[in-house]
């Protein structure tokens, strides 16, 4: 029989190796906030003829938008003049729909690059952006507290029910840090922004992670009643092996669906789907190799043992 519990420190180490780089980027550079959080205008258009992104930036700079963020989307082609594309996304200071500022920009773009089709035009004020950001933080915090309370109540008949809730929250935070950390890296190097859909993805990842964790915890609870006399380590290991295939199969079904959405869906939901993909993979891993194994470490007082072992060594030096 495979002994998953025996390798728990290796799984903890792997989690740290994944989380630490993203956390460093998050602390040093933060997330690249979209207009939903900072305010501004997101404008996505598709020209009839291919254009160079550098030329679009130059046109916007001439109109007074020197700090505009411009990037391509969709198919690109290489020509003698450089890389060209028909799809252009622009992040600008707040511009109202049907305003003189927008009319001026439309005239500049059409006179220089020809006709285009407007795909998306979204404008959010700074005050609304701050409100969305604050509400997003509150939503995630309330979801975490609700999960902790529910798990503690659901497992109230086992010993130390709050341990189950706390370990589930730790696994959930693991998944959130993985997603947020990767998006901090993508934001720094590829200009990927987060918006309200990103918060929706995080809440979905939290729900999936906790759901998967509860399935494993519930099997541990059942086996504690059925396998009276066996050690907690043995019960957890058996429970993990019994739920492993089910967890992986469920996750793979979701992952294949998300992959189809990522490659064949619209550009506006790509980052949302990417966040879900990362979160589902991380949630599957953490529910199997983190949450339940943390219960074992807590039961065995593993971390106290490590601290006690390091204290004499520190005193000897």
Curated annotation (Swiss-Prot):
Organism superkingdom: Bacteria
Keyword Phosphoprotein: no
SUPFAM superfamilies: Multidrug efflux transporter AcrB transmembrane domain (SSF82866)
Protein family membership: Belongs to the SecD/SecF family. SecF subfamily.
Any GO molecular function: protein-transporting ATPase activity
Originating organism: Thermobaculum terrenum (strain ATCC BAA-798 / CCMEE 7001 / YNP1)
Gene label: secF
GO BP annotation list: intracellular protein transmembrane transport; protein targeting; protein transport by the Sec complex
Keywords linked to the UniProt accession: Cell membrane, Membrane, Protein transport, Translocation, Transmembrane, Transmembrane helix, Transport
Lineage per the UniProt record: Bacteria, Bacillati, Chloroflexota, Chloroflexia, Candidatus Thermobaculales
Protein localization: Cell membrane
Topology of the protein relative to the lipid bilayer: Multi-pass membrane protein
This protein's GO CC annotations: plasma membrane
InterPro entries: SecD/SecF_arch_bac, SecD/SecF_bac, SecD/SecF_CS, SecD_SecF_C, SecF_bac
Parts of the chain that traverse the membrane: 11-31, 135-155, 166-186, 197-217, 244-266, 276-298
Pfam families assigned to the protein according to its UniProt record, in alphabetical order: Sec_GG (PF07549), SecD_SecF_C (PF02355)
The protein's name in its UniProt record: Protein translocase subunit SecF
Self-association state and partner proteins as the record states: Forms a complex with SecD. Part of the essential Sec protein translocation apparatus which comprises SecA, SecYEG and auxiliary proteins SecDF. Other proteins may also be involved.
Purpose: Part of the Sec protein translocase complex. Interacts with the SecYEG preprotein conducting channel. SecDF uses the proton motive force (PMF) to complete protein translocation after the ATP-dependent function of SecA.
């Amino acid at each position: 029989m495979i002994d998953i519990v025996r390798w728990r420190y290796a799984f903890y180490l792997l989690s740290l190796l994944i989380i630490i780089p993203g956390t460093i980027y998050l602390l040093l550079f933060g997330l690249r906030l979209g207009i939903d959080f900072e305010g501004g205008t997101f404008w996505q258009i598709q020209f009839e003829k291919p254009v160079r992104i550098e030329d679009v930036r130059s046109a916007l700079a001439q109109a007074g938008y020197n700090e505009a963020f411009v990037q391509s989307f969709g198919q690109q082609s290489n020509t003698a003049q450089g890389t060209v594309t028909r799809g252009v996304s622009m992040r600008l200071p707040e511009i109202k729909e049907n305003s003189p500022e927008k009319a001026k920009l439309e005239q500049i773009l059409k006179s220089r690059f020809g006709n285009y089709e407007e795909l998306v035009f979204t404008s959010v004020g700074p005050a609304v952006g701050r409100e969305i950001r604050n509400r997003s933080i509150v939503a995630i915090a309330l979801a975490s507290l609700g999960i902790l309370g529910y798990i503690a109540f659901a497992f109230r008949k086992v010993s130390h029910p709050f341990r189950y809730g706390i370990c589930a929250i730790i696994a959930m935070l693991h998944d959130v840090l993985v997603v947020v950390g990767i998006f901090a890296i993508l934001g720094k190097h590829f200009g990927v922004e987060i918006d309200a859909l990103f918060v929706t993805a995080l809440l979905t990842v939290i729900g999936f992670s906790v759901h998967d964790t509860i399935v494993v915890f519930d099997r541990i609870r059942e086996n504690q009643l059925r396998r009276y006399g066996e050690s907690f380590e043995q019960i957890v290991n058996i429970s993990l092996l019994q739920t492993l295939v089910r967890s992986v199969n469920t996750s793979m079904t979701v992952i294949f669906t998300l992959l189809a959405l990522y490659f064949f869906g619209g550009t506006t939901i790509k980052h949302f789907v990417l966040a879900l993909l990362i979160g589902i993979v991380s949630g599957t891993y953490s529910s199997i190799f983190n949450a339940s194994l943390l219960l074992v470490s807590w039961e065995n007082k593993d971390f106290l043992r490590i601290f006690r072992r390091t204290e004499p060594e520190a005193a000897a030096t």
